[in-house]
Amino acid sequence: MELTVRHTGGVRFEAQTRGHRLICDQPAVNGGEDLGMTPPELLLSSLGTCAGFYALAYLKARSLPSDGLTVKVTAEKATKPARLDHIVIEVKAPGCPPEQESWIQRSIEACLIHNTLTHSPHIETVVRVGELAHVS
């Protein structure tokens, strides 16, 4: 999996992969134009949409109703180091029988983004400047 992020002016960036584009910006208070979500909002969006996809897959596989399926993700900002903490995924499936609740939760906890966040990935940062930094 690979994507490219390019600075497009101000504090705005554009991520591109597989022909798709996504704008990331900051609110005016942080010097941006508020043309897109912030990086933390995008992270929570990835988690929420992944959780929603896994919940939907579970419901569809069992011919359970998915009407009104919604996912709300909240988080608190923490410091030292700066990060998001206490992330809560709230899934609502109004037409689904209550006895499916724990099974839906298990399916959500199997999602790729959930697993990535709960099992710390190895992250390597490589910086290239000058001659080595020519953008292709």
Show where each model-derived region lies:
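Extended beta-strand/beta-hairpin segments
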Residues: M1-S45, F53-S136
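Alpha-helical metal-binding/catalytic segments enriched in His/Glu/Asp
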Residues: C50
